[in-house]
Amino acid sequence: MNHIQEAFLNTLKVERNFSEHTLKSYQDDLIQFNQFLEQEHLQLNTFEYRDARNYLSYLYSNHLKRTSVSRKISTLRTFYEYWMTLDENIINPFVQLVHPKKEKYLPQFFYEEEMEALFKTVEEDTSKSLRDRVILELLYATGIRVSELVNIKKQDIDFYANGVTVFGKGSKERFVPFGAYCRQSIENYLEHFKPIQSCNHDFLIVNMKGEAITERGVRYVLNDIVKRTAGVSEIHPHKLRHTFATHLLNQGADLRTVQSLLGHVNLSTTGKYTHVSNQQLRKVYLNAHPRAKKENET
């Protein structure tokens, strides 16, 4: 990558507080774009709209999903927007490109029984289980992103208000409450997990060496929990975030409150969870309405 692209990625990291996972996706998108430029003997600063259309066709020829193509085009559009702020001679060849529609999907989530099974797995009386449980509790109790979790400092925990201050996308600060189970797991972790007691930094979640845990480290912990949990086959941090939102809506929380807790800028982003909770609404309706079923139906 050239220095402009490296500066762009650094801006996303420092000023917009992008997670390492998101930054890696942006970096991969730029690398693939550079390979196309080299293959077609094109230059970054003279890339035109017709070239952008050819690149779109190139992406589809690689049998990528529409979601992936959409993200890659969005990455390049954002990159050129950044470059235009530095050089007035640069044009954005992707600004008029028709954005491929994303495939609609329903967020995956865990049922309450599955969450109980996951928590049972980390009930073991070991040092590692103390740390693993606090990761699971915080992600489920607050719905925070994994990038927010790994950046929590000890001083961000408020035991008087029972909540945590996190810094989300764009370094936006928000306070998220947590319940009694989560509070207890944090207290037990701080009191009995030896690596956290001997470290020379303020990060709350650490690995077994006392170093601040990484996003990759959190994913490793969650995958390890799943391997030891019967009846649960797949987990990722965002699935716990989806579960947090879905369970709140299923229990009657309003969409605006969930939006605030998740740190979503647009209500439409939170709205995707209503499609999931509608399943619960239908279940309640079928069980409660006197004429929802015929007599011979079960």
Swiss-Prot record:
Domain (Core-binding (CB)) spans 1-84
Any one Pfam family match given in the protein's UniProt record, by short name: Phage_int_SAM_1
- What is the annotated localization of this protein? Cytoplasm
Write down the superkingdom of origin. Answer: Bacteria
Q: Which GO terms describe its molecular function?
A: DNA binding; tyrosine-based site-specific recombinase activity
Q: Please name the CDD domains in this protein's record.
A: INT_XerDC_C
SUPFAM superfamilies registered for this protein in UniProt: DNA breaking-rejoining enzymes
Q: By its UniProt entry, which NCBIfam families does this protein fall under?
A: PRK00283.1, recomb_XerA_Arch, recomb_XerC
Q: How does this chain assemble?
A: Forms a cyclic heterotetrameric complex composed of two molecules of XerC and two molecules of XerD.
The protein's job, in short, is:
Site-specific tyrosine recombinase, which acts by catalyzing the cutting and rejoining of the recombining DNA molecules. The XerC-XerD complex is essential to convert dimers of the bacterial chromosome into monomers to permit their segregation at cell division. It also contributes to the segregational stability of plasmids.
Q: Which HAMAP family match?
A: Recomb_XerC_XerD
Q: What is this protein called?
A: Tyrosine recombinase XerC
Provenance organism: Staphylococcus aureus (strain bovine RF122 / ET3-1)
Taxonomic classification: Bacteria, Bacillati, Bacillota, Bacilli, Bacillales
Q: Which gene encodes it?
A: xerC
